[in-house]
Amino acid sequence: WDSGFIALGYSHFNLKYALDEINTLLRGQWKDGMIPHILFHDLNTNYYPNHSVWNCGNKIKSSGITQPPVLAIVLRKILDKNKINYKEITKIRSIIKKVIKYHKWLIKYRDPNYSGLVSILHPWESGYDNSPLWDEPLKEIKIEKDLKYKRGDNKVINSKYRPLDIDYDRYV
């Protein structure tokens, strides 16, 4: 969903950048329509969980979870704000087809009872990745002692702004 918001920002000064951002994300779309929350263009193993942990993706290695479906709203805002030429309309039509495929995936796999409510399977899918809202439900997850992985997120950003190790253990 980050790419959607980045594209929306780009659209204020460069429509090509905005459409390129969305198309880069959509290159990682799975055959069944799912859009993963991370695409691993760089197969760096210093990030955890990395591409080898997820072991997912078609042409581009990816995570196995998604994030909130904001692309349709983003596209609407981009179209409302910009004058679109014929070449851009062709690109946008291609994007719209892929977004529709994603929405069909959400209905099929995340709302099989057609309740209108899409399910999430992991806190990272919510858009509220490290929110305290998850503290109570995650306490119910029993974790193994001494999980073998190295975090990189708390090395790049001050660890006081990142989840505690016990919370991260529950995420993974």
Please provide the spans of the model-predicted regions.
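Extended ligand-binding clefts on enzyme/binding-domain cores
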Residues: 93, 103-172
